[in-house]
Amino acid sequence: NVDISLFIHDLPGKSDTTAFSTADASGSTSQAANVIEGMESGTGLFLIDEDTSATNFMVRDELMQRVFADSEDPITPVISRVRDLYEKLEISSILVAGSSGSYFHVADTVIQMKEYVPYDITERAKAIAAEFPPFTASVRPFALPSFQRHPLPDKVLTGSDRTKVKVMGQESILVNKSLTDLRAVEQLTDSEQLSGLAALLLEAAERAMDGKKTLIQVVDLLEKEMDEKGLLALLAPGRPGNLARPRRQEIFACLNRCRNLKFR
């Protein structure tokens, strides 16, 4: 139930991209959901590596824009939204790229890595880019995504007298029969963080996810508990010990990847 309409619209089959759910996301829809997840978590910066991004989600060159009208392409690429993200929401972006000079037109700063040494080449890059005025097709108006997602109570997480928790390294957590795959959350660095996420998932299920609170409110409540009581707030029979506190962004990542959770 993620609103990815800022980037994805008019999908085949009339899928509603303002409340999008799928079990087989493409590279572009997956990355769109990831960006929206970051926005929902309150991030102020996106770090994007071109090598691990969906090309059609990042940029459309002039020829592609001329051949296919915006109305014929379901994707509004990042390059068409990156200035809006910064100017309207104060969200910066750092992109590692080497495939397209189109990014020079929207970048504030251009840094070249030469033999592992960074050089600021903004002035030169902008001067050369000015010789190649960008062709800009019409882009849908910027509209802030809806973050009114309300996680519903989950019996798999709370319906057992004996809670079983298994932390599988830095890859996933299993709570009762609910598996949360965190392999793609690369910023997690140790199993203690996953233990913390498992405890937070249980805390959210038992005390916060009632179908009335939004996901943002649920995470706010979890962070408030940890701010006031530390990780002791998460200790309870059946829950893992040896915890490390994850960041707000990782809590959102965990809750969004728990396949058992349903939202309204």
Regions found by a protein language model. Give the residues of each.
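P-loop NTPase switch/communication element
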Residues: 1-25, 59-60
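Short C-terminal domain-edge/linker segments immediately following a structured domain
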Residues: 19-27, 77-80, 124-128, 140-144
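Conserved alpha-helical scaffold flanking the Walker A/P-loop in AAA+ ATPase domains
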Residues: 26-39
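Short, contiguous clusters of charged residues that form electrostatic/catalytic patches at enzyme active sites
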Residues: 33, 77-80, 195
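Conserved P-loop NTPase nucleotide-binding/switch module
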Residues: 38-88, 96-127
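Conserved NTP phosphate-binding and transfer environment spanning the P-loop NTPase/kinase superfamily
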Residues: 84-90, 96-264
